[in-house]
Swiss-Prot record:
Annotated GO CC locations: extracellular region
Ranges for domain C-type lectin: 1-19
UniProt keyword annotation of Ion transport present: no
Disulfide topology: C4-C15
Name by which UniProt lists this protein: C-type lectin domain-containing protein 2
Record's keyword annotation contains DNA repair: no
The organism of origin for this protein: Daboia russelii (Russel's viper)
Location in or out of the cell: Secreted
Keyword terms: Disulfide bond, Lectin, Secreted
Tissue: Expressed by the venom gland.
GO molecular function terms noted in the UniProt entry: carbohydrate binding
Coiled coil: none
Family of the protein in this entry: Belongs to the true venom lectin family.
């Protein structure tokens, strides 16, 4: 499990911002 910023999701070994 990866640590992403609040409001971000982890997918395919990267974090991306969800809106």
């Amino acid at each position: 499990n990866q640590d992403c910023r609040p409001g971000w999701s982890f997918y395919e070994q990267n974090c991306y911002k969800v809106f």
